From Swiss-Prot:
<feature type="repeat" description="2">
    <location>
        <begin position="238"/>
        <end position="319"/>
    </location>
</feature>
<dbReference type="GO" id="GO:0097550">
    <property type="term" value="C:transcription preinitiation complex"/>
</dbReference>
<dbReference type="InterPro" id="IPR000812">
    <property type="entry name" value="TFIIB"/>
</dbReference>
<dbReference type="InterPro" id="IPR013150">
    <property type="entry name" value="TFIIB_cyclin"/>
</dbReference>
<keyword id="KW-0677">Repeat</keyword>
<keyword id="KW-0479">Metal-binding</keyword>
<dbReference type="InterPro" id="IPR023486">
    <property type="entry name" value="TFIIB_CS"/>
</dbReference>
<dbReference type="InterPro" id="IPR023484">
    <property type="entry name" value="TFIIB_arc"/>
</dbReference>
<dbReference type="Pfam" id="PF00382">
    <property type="entry name" value="TFIIB"/>
</dbReference>
<comment type="function">
    <text>Stabilizes TBP binding to an archaeal box-A promoter. Also responsible for recruiting RNA polymerase II to the pre-initiation complex (DNA-TBP-TFIIB).</text>
</comment>
<keyword id="KW-0862">Zinc</keyword>
<feature type="binding site">
    <location>
        <position position="35"/>
    </location>
    <ligand>
        <name>Zn(2+)</name>
    </ligand>
</feature>
<feature type="repeat" description="1">
    <location>
        <begin position="144"/>
        <end position="227"/>
    </location>
</feature>
<dbReference type="InterPro" id="IPR013763">
    <property type="entry name" value="Cyclin-like_dom"/>
</dbReference>
<dbReference type="InterPro" id="IPR013137">
    <property type="entry name" value="Znf_TFIIB"/>
</dbReference>
<dbReference type="GO" id="GO:0017025">
    <property type="term" value="F:TBP-class protein binding"/>
</dbReference>
<dbReference type="Pfam" id="PF08271">
    <property type="entry name" value="Zn_Ribbon_TF"/>
</dbReference>
Length: 328
């Protein structure tokens, strides 16, 4: 079957032209049948044309988008009829309905006392239906803990999502008996932060958790082993950007600190030492070398390590980097 072709200059042809073409394809297999040029789709006009010779390959194309039009992001959000995407950060993945606590009707008017009592009963039953068994209640409590701790650290949603998936796996493989919900939730967040290269030290995690450092460490090792989590050893350099930001130091300090850590790693002095202590000492040394004064106490507070650790690592890092001594 042949289709009549029309070009922008009004000429006609009778060569065979495929009636259906990919709207966004620009490779050779879906090029212009006349000159093999790239095809361009005008969604407003419903036309697919050749960008080289102007051949109209397809006319009156079907618009697969919504039937409504929006001219800005706000209008698009208001007219969209789909809900939020599913998320592992909620125990029901965000698929259930939640009744708000505003006690107002659709027009913004305050509900009467009788209506408020009715809504309170509905909320109570709604919450019961959302968590139908002990497993869902367990998951709801744990994900709430993960959200609370991640918010305290300012961790991105990607880390929270990963931590939620790790906890779901631990729950699914029955790793919780004999361990607290808070302990497993904290270890899941600790592992997720390390996997995303935004690590937090055990001391930092323990400062916002409801369990102590020892339990977090034990639970983390158990969960990582049972779930075969791929968690690489923490790179001290991954702490440097956060420390520099908290201390309001420049990018020069951050770059110098990374160079010092790289030299220390090449010299083999980082093995068996705390990554947090190495990062703190490198930031302190880099600040002094770039004439941006910062005290050991300030670095100690931000990194949550002792000043003694900073002093010890400081001299080792300078020696490894071949830097001249700077009075601490």
């Amino acid at each position: 079957m042949t289709n009549q072709r029309t070009t922008r200059d009004g000429s006609h042809g009778t060569e065979s032209v495929p009636t259906q073409r990919s709207r966004e394809s620009t490779d050779e297999d879906h090029g212009c049948p006349e000159c093999n040029g790239d095809l361009v789709t005008d969604e407003d006009r419903g036309e697919t044309t050749c960008g080289e010779c102007g051949l109209v390959v397809e006319e009156d194309g079907i618009d697969h988008g919504p039937e409504w039009r929006a001219f800005n992001a706000q209008e698009q959000d208001e007219k969209s009829r789909v809900g939020a995407p599913t998320t592992n950060m909620m125990h029901d993945k965000g698929l259930s309905t939640n009744i708000g606590w505003q006690d107002k009707d659709a027009y913004g008017n305050t509900l009467s006392g009788r209506q408020r009592r009715k809504m309170q009963r509905l909320r109570k039953w709604n919450e019961r239906f959302r968590t139908r068994n002990s497993k869902e209640r367990n998951l709801k409590q744990a994900l709430g803990e993960i959200e609370r701790m991640a918010s305290a650290f300012g961790l991105p949603d990607s880390v929270r999502e990963t931590a939620s998936v790790i906890y779901r796996r631990a729950l699914g493989e029955d790793l919780l008996p004999g361990r607290s919900i808070e302990g497993v939730a904290t270890s899941a967040l600790y592992a997720a932060a390390r996997q995303a290269n935004t690590p937090r030290s055990l001391d930092e995690v323990a400062s916002v958790s409801r369990v102590d450092r020892g339990e977090i460490a034990r639970t983390y090792r158990y969960v990582a082993r049972e779930l075969s989590l791929e968690v690489a050893p923490t790179d001290p350099a991954s702490y440097v950007p956060r420390f520099c930001s908290d201390l309001e130091l420049s990018g020069d300090v951050e770059r110098r600190a990374r160079d010092l850590l790289a030299a220390a790693a090449d010299a083999g002095i980082t093995s068996g030492k705390s990554p947090v202590g190495l990062a703190a000492a490198s930031v302190y040394a880099a600040a002094l070398l770039t004439n941006e004064r910062v005290t050991q106490n300030e670095v100690s507070t931000v990194a949550n390590v002792s000043e003694v650790t900073i002093r010890n690592r400081y001299h080792e890092i300078l020696d490894a980097g071949g830097e001249p001594g700077v009075e601490a």
